[in-house]
Amino acid sequence: MNGLLASDKYVVIVGLGATGLSVARYLHLRGERFSVVDTREHPPGADELMALNNKVDHHFGAVEQPQIDLLLNAAEIVLSPGVDRRTDFIQAALKNNISIVGDIELFLREVQVPVVGITGSNGKSTVTALMAAVGAKAGFKTCAAGNIGLPVLDALQENAELYILELSSFQLESVSRPGLTVACMLNVSEDHMDRYNRFVDYCMAKQRIYFGAQNVVYNIDDKLTQPPIVDGVARRGFSLSKPIEEGESAFYFSADTGNLCAAKDNLINIDQIKIFGRHNVANVLAVFAMADALNITRAATCAAVQEFSGLDHRCQWVAKKRGVTFINDSKATNVGAAQAAIAGLSASFKRILLIAGGDGKDANFFSFGKLVDAHVAVLILMGRDAGAIADCVSDTTPVVQAQTMTEAVEVAFSSAEEGDLVLLSPACASFDMFAGFEDRGRQFAAAVEGLTE
């Protein structure tokens, strides 16, 4: 699958950062001629790019006519996922029939081993990490890459026998036909409305993961994840209740027994799973379905699931003080993720005191407000869109505004009782107040540690 990039013209990388830099390394190693365009004056990765090749053609700053001409005459544009396809100069290239791809497309042209792709509004990183652990437990040299952190083109250096890719909607936009060994969509809820004109556009980007797949795994409980019916494509569904229709291979949770099941077989009991919440039961079911598609034994899958304790900042246990549990779900950067955490944890605690807020990315908080009214005893809000969230909560739910994470944690703890949960699950991005969701989670943990009992 080599040699698919044209060599008589420049390939243009639009957007540097971690992904763009990985593309530059990939093209440089293959002797391809390329140029780099980034609208930022000092984009991350600029020094590394110069160290790679100090003569590389590049433009940092506002895109003007010379850069537009370059794009309109490119052999191919490799677009970083952080760059909005609605940008004027990208739209001009599309109208000029210039091929626009992403690093995932380049990776899939190159790779010769099985590739599993995982998308969804929530749970992608957790499921990707767990699926990689399952692959390793089954004896494959396995590599997790993509949106989880390691750029896929850098992952080629791992020479893995099995790749597990976390794929965002932005990455899927720039792949023509993924053709994955297994394609999985966990769930779909409103997110990134600052990057999409309509919710349906976001859903359509997610659906691209199924194009050309050999096996598809989807959430029976979420109609938006339903894949198209294609002859020869094996379908596996998962559900938090036993499906009424038995026409397809289904992996489900039996509330009566606490068992995760496949047909009439018990796979594992919920008590053997270390990660919190019903939403993580769904995630584990998805992993069993994907492992089945890869012909990985259930024994290997069970062993990996039992050992997996989750990822930082995803429903992560922090401490228990004065009988009050603290959980860090800072990675809940959208409404759907926070709703999954609240609904999934509410049955395990007397009350929930929720810390939320931040950059809402133009989300609609109406459904979030209804869930808060039903399950949250006290809502502590912070960040840019605190007011937008407060407007969607009824007057019967106590709402407190906090200016810092320390203040939010102290307010929550002072209002909490034994058996309660203080949950950081913001339903928003973090960049209005923090360096990222990791920084937000660390500040939460530090504030909890600083509490006096």
From Swiss-Prot:
InterPro entries (alphabetical): Mur-like_cat_sf, Mur_ligase_C, Mur_ligase_C_dom_sf, Mur_ligase_cen, MurD
UniProt keyword list: ATP-binding, Cell cycle, Cell division, Cell shape, Cell wall biogenesis/degradation, Cytoplasm, Ligase, Nucleotide-binding, Peptidoglycan synthesis
GO cellular component: cytoplasm
Catalytic reaction equation(s): UDP-N-acetyl-alpha-D-muramoyl-L-alanine + D-glutamate + ATP = UDP-N-acetyl-alpha-D-muramoyl-L-alanyl-D-glutamate + ADP + phosphate + H(+)
The keyword Cell membrane appears for this protein: no
Protein's cellular compartments: Cytoplasm
EC number(s) from the headed UniProt entry: 6.3.2.9
Gene Ontology BP terms: cell division; cell wall organization; peptidoglycan biosynthetic process; regulation of cell shape
Binding of ATP, residues: G120, S121, N122, G123, K124, S125, T126
Any one GO MF annotation of this record: UDP-N-acetylmuramoylalanine-D-glutamate ligase activity
Similarity section: Belongs to the MurCDEF family.
Name of the protein this chain belongs to: UDP-N-acetylmuramoylalanine--D-glutamate ligase
Organism, as annotated: Teredinibacter turnerae (strain ATCC 39867 / T7901)
